Each structure stands twice: as structure tokens, then as C-alpha cells.
Design a protein with these regions (language model features):
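Extreme N-terminus of proteins, especially the signal/transit-peptide cleavage junction
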Residues: 1-8, 141
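Residue-identity detector for glutamine
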Residues: 3, 11-14, 38, 98, ...
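Charge-dense, low-complexity intrinsically disordered segments
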Residues: 4, 28, 165-169
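Terminal helix-turn-helix DNA-binding modules in bacterial transcription factors
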Residues: 7, 11-27, 47-82, 109-131
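Short, well-ordered helical secondary-structure segments
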Residues: 12, 44, 49, 72, ...
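A solvent-exposed interaction/effector surface
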Residues: 63, 70, 89, 93-171
Length: 171
């Protein structure tokens, strides 16, 4: 299987997840979107994204739920059911495990948390192919210290030689 075929298949799965984020998604649905078997779809998804499809889906749903809790005055139970969690207890456990703060406390006092914001896999590989690097990649940096020293302006004394046949006659 060619690399770009894998990338396009994972991109189709990402698009399907983004389109159906608020409805139940099965591995069978993702496999149909990718056009491969369930096993192969899950394998290439993990290979290219570093997460299984359901780890990816859960992290994405929790991050979108955190944004909704932060930006609106929605109840925790409503947000939990909107993002396809079976109960608010399960949602609270998952939210607390992911972000280290309960959703109720986060909605009352939103502190900065690390949200899962995945990039489109196709765009990522296109930029990698072009040779562009991410700002998060560390490059070898060299530090240069500069010290400004102010000195008085110099004056020039120029004395031209009257008779000289070579350079050393001037000395």
C-alpha cells in the first residue's frame, strides 16, 4: 500500500469523525469511510496519528466539551449527553482524567488546560513533504552576546610624502 493511500484513508476517517462527532461512531463506520477492513483501518490510523481511533475520538470529544463548558453556561449533564457519553458520571471521570479538573469546577472557573487539537493528517504530510518545519520542533540555536561599547570619535592625521620611491621611504 502506498503511503499517500494510507494518508488519504486516515484523512477520510478524520473527516468522518469531525462530521459525526455528536453521534455514536463505530469502527465499522470508520472502516467504511476509509474503504478498508476494520483491522487495517485501525492499524493505519494508529500508525499515522499515534492514537487508536477511539483514543482520538475520546480526546477530541472531551476537548470540544471543554470548549462548550468554557464558552457557554450549559449544564455538565447536557454537555455529556451532547458528546455521546452514557452518563454524567462517566463523563466526569473521563474529563477529570484527561484534564485534571472536574467539569463542574472547570465551567465555573476555566483555567488553562491542554486541549486536543489535531491537525488534518493530509495537511501535516504535505507540509512535511515541502520541508517546512513546525514551530514546536527544536532547532540548534546559537546564542550570541553583544556588548555595545561607546568610544570617542577618532581624528585622522594625514601626512603625505613629498619624495618617495617605495613604500618604506614613507616610514
Amino acid at each position: 500500500m502506498e503511503r499517500w493511500e494510507k494518508i488519504n484513508a486516515v484523512q477520510r476517517m478524520q473527516d468522518y469523525i469531525n462530521k459525526h462527532i455528536n453521534s455514536p461512531i463505530t469502527l465499522s463506520d470508520l472502516a467504511k469511510a476509509a474503504g478498508y477492513s476494520q483491522y487495517h483501518s485501525a492499524r493505519i490510523f494508529r500508525e499515522l496519528t499515534g492514537k487508536s481511533p477511539f483514543e482520538y475520538l475520546r480526546a477530541l470529544r472531551l476537548s470540544k466539551a471543554a470548549l462548550r463548558l468554557r464558552d457557554s453556561r450549559a449544564k455538565v449533564i447536557d454537555v455529556a449527553f451532547d458528546f455521546v457519553f452514557d452518563s454524567h458520571e462517566g463523563f466526569t471521570r473521563a474529563f477529570t482524567k484527561q484534564f485534571g479538573i472536574p467539569p463542574k469546577k472547570y465551567s465555573e472557573d476555566p483555567k488553562p488546560i491542554k486541549l486536543f487539537m489535531p491537525s488534518r493528517i493530509r495537511d501535516y504530510y504535505l507540509t512535511m513533504q515541502k520541508g517546512e518545519t513546525d514551530m514546536s520542533e527544536k532547532k540548534d540555536t546559537k546564542t550570541v552576546f553583544v556588548q555595545v561599547v561607546e568610544r570617542p570619535a577618532r581624528k585622522l592625521i594625514l601626512k603625505r610624502g613629498i619624495k618617495a620611491d617605495n613604500y618604506f621611504d614613507y616610514c
